[in-house]
């Protein structure tokens, strides 16, 4: 017996399950799709590489420009150090004479003569310099310094540190020199005053000797790095014959010492100093 038409059920086949990748089918086809992806990725890589190359080129140019500007500052550091080294024996001789004056004076100090240079009074004629390294400070501030080669970075960093130390020593020297100006007057000498004067004199002698050692080390380091000025430039700055007026461009202390028969050193003796900026075990002192 036939069933009614309404009872006839037609089985509809279920669609086959497709993987996630199969469900996604780009309209241009897979080959074209992956070609587009590769092109985009390559474009990004090339753009990044080009940007990095431009940045590297810019930093390289900044380093080259910085090196050119640094040479002037390095020359001044060498010249100031040479002046400090040459005049230290003269400074020490002046201080030794002051000490003898204190010891040999009776109850009243024999006053010492005062000198004046560029409106500055002094009892001890010694170099006075700014001891600055401004170009390197600027290169540190704008980030250029970090792109210098490691060995060069170490040398320039050491010079910068030495200049900061030299400024600190200069401040101490001026304080002691100012305190000793009292020796221009015939002051009463009791044991306490006599001891204070001798203490300040000997502190200044010790400070001067330490500065000479550091000055010679700086000169050696700069010379070994190939940045030392010529002998003619050094001799002209030291101005031993007094042909040029004392000031920022020429020393007046060397001529002062020489004209009074006070001892001076040879600026070239920095070559006798052993010095290196390498880390322990990485280099041999020269």
Please tell me what each predicted stretch does.
Residues 36-50:
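Hydrophobic membrane-insertion alpha-helices, especially the h-region
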């Amino acid at each position: 017996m036939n069933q009614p038409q309404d009872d006839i059920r037609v089985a509809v086949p279920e669609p086959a399950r497709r993987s996630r990748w199969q469900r996604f089918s780009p309209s241009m086809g897979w080959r074209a799709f992956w070609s587009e992806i590769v092109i985009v990725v390559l474009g990004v890589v090339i753009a990044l590489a080009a940007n990095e190359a431009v940045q590297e080129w810019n930093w390289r140019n900044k380093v080259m420009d910085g090196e050119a500007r640094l040479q002037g500052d390095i020359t001044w550091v060498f010249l100031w150090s040479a002046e400090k080294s040459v005049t230290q024996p003269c400074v020490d001789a002046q201080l030794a004479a002051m000490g003898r004056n204190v010891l040999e004076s009776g109850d009243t100090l024999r006053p010492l003569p005062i000198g004046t240079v560029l409106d500055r009074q002094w009892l001890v004629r010694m170099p006075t310099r700014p001891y600055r390294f401004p170009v390197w400070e600027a290169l540190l501030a704008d980030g250029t310094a970090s792109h210098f080669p490691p060995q060069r970075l170490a040398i320039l960093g050491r010079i910068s540190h030495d200049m900061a130390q030299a400024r600190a020593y200069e401040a101490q020297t001026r304080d002691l020199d100012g305190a000793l100006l009292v020796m221009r007057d015939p002051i009463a000498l009791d044991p306490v005053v006599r001891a204070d004067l001798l203490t300040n004199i000997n502190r200044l002698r010790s400070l001067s000797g330490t500065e000479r050692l550091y000055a010679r080390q700086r000169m050696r380091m700069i010379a070994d790095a190939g940045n030392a000025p010529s002998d003619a430039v050094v001799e002209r700055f030291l101005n031993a014959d007094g042909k040029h007026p004392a000031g920022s461009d020429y020393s007046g202390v060397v001529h002062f010492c020489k004209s009074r028969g006070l001892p001076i050193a040879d600026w070239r003796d920095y070559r006798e100093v052993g010095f290196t900026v390498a880390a322990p075990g990485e280099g041999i002192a020269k």
